[in-house]
Amino acid sequence: MRRNILSMFLFITLIIYSSIFAVNVRIKDFAKFRGARDNQLFGVGIVVGLNGTGDSGTLNSTLLSNMLKNFGVAVNPNDLKTKNAALVMVVADIPPFYKPGMRLDVEVASINDAKSLRNGILLQTPLYGADGNVYAVAQGPVSVGGEDVKGSVNLQKRFPVVGYIPEGALVEREIPFSIVDGNSVTILLNKPDFTTAARTALAINTKFGTNIAKALDGASVKVNIPNVFSDDVISFLALLEEIEVPVDVVAQVVINERTGTVVFGGDIGIADFVLSYGNFVITISNGQIGDKKATIGNLITALKSLGATPQDIIAVVQELYKAGVIFAQLKIM
């Protein structure tokens, strides 16, 4: 319906139905084993090859002079007046079970007053773990994304002092992990939920025909390793990962007022209500067919079909949440 028609007083009655359902998801897609986790690495390095967009001041000159001494080249810091280098922080995440020789993606960010890292090359930089040990070494050309285009709002928001080096770090040391605790393993849900934890234990017990799994709380499920797998734990873990569990999608509405977007997931129900907003008077009436109910998804679809703007929809959703008729969490960004 055209926007000019919306200038008229509208009375809308919506009778909306939606089935309640859960999605079957493999355990490996919504959980992980305790002990198998990423670790953060960090280091401080120098990006060179910048075309006058590097750091100013004497800090860089001192660092470069010290670095050159390691190669047997003695240079007075006062003679190194260059803006072609920048001091950067280098960070990376190392996944579990990564072996020496495997590669990691790396991010770099300017520490000082560099204008851009574009076309620069990161010199060899050791990456440390929280324990102070070196686990990887990073080096390579820095990418800061596409070229800035004059007049483009999106591209003007680029940050050329933050860069990325795909597979820019080489793992030098493996981080030790321990998954098995005695004769059991613990599954950790990525998002704690009592219902999903209980269903996970039930699905595992059903798969193996015995009560080997027990939900400890909303985030963890303890699984005893059957004797038949005592010498082949990896095969047992692989079987666990492939078990499908009916997982409820969390009822949540996320609003980004800057971009005018509304994101919603799960079976988000809404109670009966009457709302007057601008030129709209909206009445929601739930049907009485089994366990079906009105949902926010159908409400938003109906509003869009009537020509409501993103700002209109955001305002309506916020008012309904304040009134307590939306059965979901609301996050505003």
Swiss-Prot record:
GO terms for cellular component: bacterial-type flagellum basal body, distal rod, P ring; outer membrane-bounded periplasmic space
UniProt-listed Pfam families: FlgI (PF02119)
Main location: periplasm
A biological process from GO: bacterial-type flagellum-dependent cell motility
Keywords: Bacterial flagellum, Periplasm, Signal
Known partners and oligomeric status: The basal body constitutes a major portion of the flagellar organelle and consists of four rings (L,P,S, and M) mounted on a central rod.
Cited function: Assembles around the rod to form the L-ring and probably protects the motor/basal body from shearing forces during rotation.
Protein name per the record: Flagellar P-ring protein
Biological source species: Fervidobacterium nodosum (strain ATCC 35602 / DSM 5306 / Rt17-B1)
Gene behind this protein: flgI
